[in-house]
Amino acid sequence: MRYTFVLGNAPSQKRFIDIRMQPSIGCNFAIKDHKLTHLIVADRMAVHEVRKLPTRTETKYWCKASPLETPPGWHDLEFPGLDSGSAALALAAELYPNNEIIAIGFDGVLGLSDENAYEYAFRPNPKPEQIRARHRATVEQIYPDLPRTRFVSYQSDPVLETISYDQALKIAITQSRSLYQEPYQA
């Protein structure tokens, strides 16, 4: 079984910093801490901030901004109405339909954390609970159309399939080792 790693905005994704996870799709500022295959940036403010960071040639950049505002070399993301985390899950399903998805850093969606520095720093309104509820509803809406997707969590969820941090780390390390032994095929 092959896996695609999707990194949300929550601080818990930092537990996986030193592991080469390929293929991987990150949201917004995950590019600071991870070597990603793909990066999804949610809006103009984030695009502006991410463009200040050094460009990584191994990463394909995607944004939801209008084509008039898409930076040179970036790709337009065609998932209207989805936040960056949900769009990253949808992109993983589109690009790697035969892979199982391991979703890391979706703490707000799972009701585990109030921390999400990106979302709340740029958008102090609406309230964090409203944002989390909207993101949760979006994930639940697209969840049935995704390949098998497991969310990394320390507790179970009534709707979304979860996996422990230890299990996810083991999968990431195992797949990372196999990357050096055989060429990857989607």
Predicted regions and their residues:
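Metal-ion/cofactor- or nucleotide/acyl-coenzyme-handling active-site neighborhoods
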Residues: 1-186
